[in-house]
Amino acid sequence: MRAWSVVIAVASLATISGSLRSQQQTPPPQPSNRGPGGARGTQIQPGQECPPGMTEIRPRNCLGPEAPAPSILDYRPKSTLIAPVHMVKTAKFPAIDYHGHPGGLLGSAQGVESLISYLDSLNVRMMVAADNMSGDRLKNALAVINASPKAKDRVRVLAGISFQNVGPGWAEKAVAQLEADIAAGAVGVGEVGKGFGLSTKKADGSRLKLDDPDLDPVWDAAARLNIPVFIHTADPQEFFEPIDYSNERWLELSLFPERRYPNDKFPKFEEVMAERDNLFRKHPKTKFVAAHMGWHANDLGRLAKMMDQMPNLYTEVGAVLYDIGRQPRAAHDFFVKYQDRILFGKDSFQPEEYPYYWRVFETADEYFDYYRDYHAFWKLYGIDLPDPVLQKLYYKNALKIVPGLPKTGFPK
């Protein structure tokens, strides 16, 4: 059902030749059985939308379905398109999942063995756990990994940073903890969570902005240690927009209301993104990896401009396959142009979802399903990347920017 705008009648009185004349805009369309030329439906004026429960079947002619309309959850049309299908169960080249969230699988020897079994089935050579671990939690995870003959060269961990109560004395402690975590075996920073810049408060109660100068010593330390910073900023722009039927993510936001960011409670999307971009510019010697393609996979021109202006910026593809796969030509060209600065990552660890990534990246298949209905109601297309680009995406770029990753198990 589409919302339609109420046409407000504006009456103006004018005296012409001694008579009173009333002027009024065209009233809202009323449902009828016939449109222009005798066609079935309801006629509307240019610029108007169809009344609720109707759709435009011809220019300016609306009609409602004869049968009761299904809900958005129940409408699941089956495509009759017959096209080539290339199911890709394993990656063509050994991959590094730079955006791993293995969760409890790193908590025990049995769990980490199970993780390796899953990775083997997908041809994922290595997972970088981006669970914001630090201190004892990080050491415990590394102990489990290093005790496993199968996992010790297959799993690495990023170090977490706590941004709570930033204020006097915070930076010195944060840098010392980061140095200790790297010495313990962490290979970078991350995943810096989306609360950073949205809801995290400083010691004085103010919102912690992404480009706050109190944080500069931490980003400078990352440059000195030669480690990348993996940062997730905010959420898709649609999450900041009104929840109406024109919002492309209406279903997701209705299923998960905690993902909404109303402007009266949170900073605006563009405000947070401006702070992020300023952070990247302020620290040109620090390598930043923007998670989820910076939430600009739906605007590759904007992301391209960022990449051109910020040579220290890299990006990662986790959880934005729905945008990559609906613009195959533009995505193909983007991945080729910036082939040295894009990393593979999956985000949530669901082994059955990885093959969708392989299919989008490796084939030219058309019009196939995405793996989660609530993310996208549209179909995907393969972007058919050439082998040299696939190799950089899957493993070479990660090996290049993360010195702490083992080099074994990859093509020479």
PLM features per residue range, with description:
Residues R260-K412:
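H/E-rich (His + Asp/Glu) clusters that bind or coordinate divalent metals
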Residues N140-R259:
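Active-site gating/metal-coordination segments in enzymes
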Residues V6-T15:
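Bacterial N-terminal signal peptides
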